[in-house]
Amino acid sequence: MTDTHFLIPRKLVLAILHHIQTQPEQEVCGLVGGNPGKAASYYPVDNIDPLKTNRFTLDGAGQIAALKTMRSRNETLVAIFHSHPHTTAQPSSLDIALGGHSGVLSLIGSTGTRGVLELRGYRLDAAENGAEVELLMGDEG
């Protein structure tokens, strides 16, 4: 990830869209592996939050399994994804308050706007406080 953009393969966007569509009324979440500045793989992780319609908590065992697979593929954690089922793909006040991980992009997806996938990236760590990062979609990967 550079300061201004992040490369994401079209097939990864489609995988995220499919995941959103499996549970359209709940927030879904997952991890994205790759190399700095470029996504390579999407790892869906169960949302174990009791308030799944507007919050997410990544399942710990699912996170560990995804990180082990990333390591075996020589990938690192480059983004954390979650969906907003009824609003736009912008950080909520809770997303901003909880912050992000330094150097890890926060991807937010939504189909809440006319059923069309909206996917956006943000840096939610304390230093950046919600700065948007342009997502560049390509056919590679």
PLM regions: where:
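Metallo-beta-lactamase
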Residues: 83
